[in-house]
Amino acid sequence: MAKRILLLIVITAFTIASNACSKRTETQNNMTTTKSDPINISSFKVRTMDGQEKSLSDFKGKVLIIVNVASKCGYTPQYDGLEKIYEKYKDKGFEILAFPCNDFGGQEPGTNEEIQSFCKTNYNVSFTLFDKIKVLGNDKSPLYSNLINYDPAGDISWNFEKFLIDKDGNVVGRYKSKVKPESEELTTAIEKLL
């Protein structure tokens, strides 16, 4: 009997200690935040669709959504929601940085010109589209190699995964593809940062 009580006490103490050491805070089902050191994107340089190098430090002072996009994906209609929130918040210091990628089922096979034309014709996209990149594998872009370390760390799971960036360039949220851009969850988080 005494051994059982002692074993129960040890298991309970271990469980409490394990939970206390956890740095994660769960928020709904789609996003996890962490209290670890922030991941900052300001030092990264990316290419615009016309091949010009652009420093992400140019966006300091703005709230950002960084999103990997594709034209032939079940989530492609999210371009519409992205454009809606861009139009709603752009005058308050908000930008969307969209990075086409062809890593998931070949769903973005087009050239930069074809992608721009598709987005303008079908969704009247006016936010910034960047050069097509890789978000998976050994040759993934340096930006995404950094972004995927935000808790819950791990590779991008599909197109239209979103990262929320504060005005200082710190990653403060990660939203899976199923979270719509105009969802209350995402727009509330954006509004808190503006």
Where in this protein do the model-derived segments appear?
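N-terminal "domain-start" segment that seeds a small globular fold
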Residues: 26-57, 142
